[in-house]
């Protein structure tokens, strides 16, 4: 155990975490030069293309240090995006130390800050590293000062490196061996194995990535999942190099994988604990929680015949992603589809892209929404994840919206614009700290405001320098209303939105104008209305296409012309009763582009 080092890499998106992992694998000789590809641990194409890590991965490396001792290094690669923060916390719980990797040109960002504080709270040894020092725009001295001022850790013994060129990589590994402590644990105690991640394999079933905190796990053991009490036989176990290697046992302090022929990912959730059935531990390892979706959206197939294919595809994706939620939803406008729950907007985009790319599905996606808490006059409480499910305004006694705690890190010169944006988004300032040229803002902002366009606008007004970290805090009573969209008198449930009453008139008007631009003209007038309850708040008309029925009349009796015009009028009326209006996909996404009124709501 004294020769084991378990560590994670904390870094913001695109600060070079996966490239640094590649250099470690290369230096330790885990893969030959022929087998090496860029971003080895990012197994999905979408991870490589977007330059992000979505699923936690692990690799065991053997390294001969300068003291001539052979060390076992277990690197746990973690996601860097705010949507996957729970996976990060579970990965950190499996480690004794972490590398804090910061880009030499971009400096410290909010997600780095959040994950670093999580590591410090867990008593992990943090080794600061400044990456990308080969860039022309690199300013390592400024970034070193930021690490000390903003994060508050000693950076005098910092390591400078370039993961791209390989400069300084051996120095980092020597620091891991020197500074990160070996694992603590009792090999003779009852088994406690932390589940870091789990995914589905078509041949083996569910594969779980685990860290042995106490005891020893052997092939053939019977293990119990402590939160559910379900028991399984360990059929295979081993570790990654990153190739999958079988072995007979995992010892205390080691990280590896195990297969128990589990066919359902919900049998083994991230953060849970395995123990031996015949010699169970007294309690589970701390920190386990069931992840709840924060953002919901409707997925509907463009072709109704693809409904079963969409159902199968979501089922397969869910095998690898326990945080994905879906249930059948029927829409008057779009037919049968699914209401899906996600950790955040990036998570939603990734799932949609995988459905379209890997399963060749053409989808209509409704605008994302958050979950609301509704208390009715008969004292029942409901959690509403779709605007169309919201009860009538007369039935609601109290409506509460989710509030997110947002930590924003921004250069001082953009502070005014960022504060104005937070006020526009109905934010309440809780804290402000100045660190040299950087400022940390803490705001409580309604989650509905955060998930729509807050991140994009924050990046836009700060020229990409501001960064954001957010987490759900609590539900708060709010004066929000449901705005329905009616087209020719028919309520289109997929276009319904929930917004604050002060913004409702503005958003209703804006939505009507957007739809008027997007809906193609027909042979009859199309009336577009928005309503709160029974009150129409905005209306517009898409004018009909008109055929000139008098073109064949060259003079003659005026009654003949009147007769033709009357006949056309009756036909248009009949067409309006039975005519179907096809709404383009842009109509559903237009809700996202409706900007909100720039005023603070108390």
Curated annotation (Swiss-Prot):
All copies of domain tr-type G, residue ranges: 2-184
The name this protein goes by in its record: Elongation factor 4
UniProt record similarity statement: Belongs to the TRAFAC class translation factor GTPase superfamily. Classic translation factor GTPase family. LepA subfamily.
Topology in the lipid bilayer: Peripheral membrane protein
Top-tier EC class: hydrolase
Lineage: superkingdom: Bacteria
Role played: Required for accurate and efficient protein synthesis under certain stress conditions. May act as a fidelity factor of the translation reaction, by catalyzing a one-codon backward translocation of tRNAs on improperly translocated ribosomes. Back-translocation proceeds from a post-translocation (POST) complex to a pre-translocation (PRE) complex, thus giving elongation factor G a second chance to translocate the tRNAs correctly. Binds to ribosomes in a GTP-dependent manner.
């Amino acid at each position: 155990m004294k020769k084991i080092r378990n560590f994670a890499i904390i870094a913001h998106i695109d600060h070079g975490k996966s490239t640094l992992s590649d250099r470690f694998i290369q230096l330790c000789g885990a893969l030959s030069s022929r087998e090496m590809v860029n971003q080895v641990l990012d197994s999905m194409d979408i991870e490589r293309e977007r330059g992000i890590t979505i699923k936690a991965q692990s690799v065991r490396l053997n390294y001969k240090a300068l003291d001539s001792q052979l060390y076992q290094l277990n690197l746990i690669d973690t996601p860097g995006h705010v949507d996957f923060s729970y996976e990060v916390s579970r990965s950190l719980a499996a480690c004794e130390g972490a590398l804090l990797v910061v880009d030499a040109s971009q400096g410290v960002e909010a997600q780095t800050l959040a994950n670093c504080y999580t590591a410090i709270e867990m008593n992990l040894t943090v080794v600061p590293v400044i990456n990308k020092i080969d860039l022309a725009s690199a300013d390592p001295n400024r970034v070193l000062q930021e690490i000390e001022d903003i994060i508050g850790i000693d950076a005098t013994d910092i390591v400078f490196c370039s993961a791209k060129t390989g400069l300084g990589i051996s120095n980092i590994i020597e620091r891991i061996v020197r500074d990160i402590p070996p694992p603590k644990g009792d090999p003779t105690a009852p088994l406690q194995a932390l589940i870091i991640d789990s995914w589905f394999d078509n041949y083996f079933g569910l594969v779980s990535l685990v860290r042995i905190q106490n005891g020893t796990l052997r092939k053939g053991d019977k293990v119990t999942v402590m939160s559910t009490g379900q028991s399984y036989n360990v059929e295979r176990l081993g570790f990654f190099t990153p190739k999958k290697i079988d072995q007979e046992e995992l010892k205390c302090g080691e990280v590896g994988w195990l297969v128990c022929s589990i066919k359902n990912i919900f049998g083994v959730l991230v953060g849970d604990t395995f123990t031996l059935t015949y010699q169970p531990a007294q309690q589970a390892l701390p920190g386990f929680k069931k992840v709840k979706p924060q953002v919901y959206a409707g997925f509907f197939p463009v072709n109704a015949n693809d409904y079963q294919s969409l159902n199968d595809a979501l089922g397969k994706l869910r095998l690898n992603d326990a945080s994905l939620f879906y249930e059948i939803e029927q829409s008057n406008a779009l037919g049968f589809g699914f209401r899906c729950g996600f950790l955040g907007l990036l998570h939603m985009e990734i799932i949609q892209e995988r459905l379209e790319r890997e399963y060749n599905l053409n989808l209509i996606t409704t605008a994302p929404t958050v979950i609301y808490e509704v208390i009715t006059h008969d004292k029942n409480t409901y959690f509403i994840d779709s605007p169309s499910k919201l009860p009538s305004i007369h039935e609601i006694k109290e409506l509460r919206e989710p509030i997110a705690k947002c930590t924003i890190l921004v250069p001082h010169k953009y502070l005014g614009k960022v504060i104005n944006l937070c006020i526009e988004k109905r934010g309440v300032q809780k804290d402000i700290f100045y660190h040299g040229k950087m400022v940390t803002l803490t705001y409580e902002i309604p989650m509905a405001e955060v998930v729509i366009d807050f991140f994009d606008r924050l990046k836009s007004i700060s020229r990409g320098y501001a960064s954001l970290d957010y987490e759900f805090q609590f539900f708060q009573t709010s004066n929000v209303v449901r705005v329905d969209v009616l087209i020719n008198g028919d309520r289109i449930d997929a276009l319904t939105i929930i917004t604050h009453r002060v913004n409702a008139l503005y958003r209703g008007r804006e939505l009507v104008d957007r739809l008027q631009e997007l809906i193609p003209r027909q042979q009859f007038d199309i009336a577009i209305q928005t309503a709160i309850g029974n009150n129409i708040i905005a209306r517009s008309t898409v004018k009909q296409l008109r055929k000139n029925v008098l073109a064949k009349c060259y003079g003659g009796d005026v009654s003949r012309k009147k007769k033709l015009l009357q006949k056309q009028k009756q036909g248009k009326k009949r067409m309006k009763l039975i005519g179907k209006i096809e709404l383009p996909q842009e109509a559903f996404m237009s809700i996202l582009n409706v900007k909100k009124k720039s005023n603070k709501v108390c």
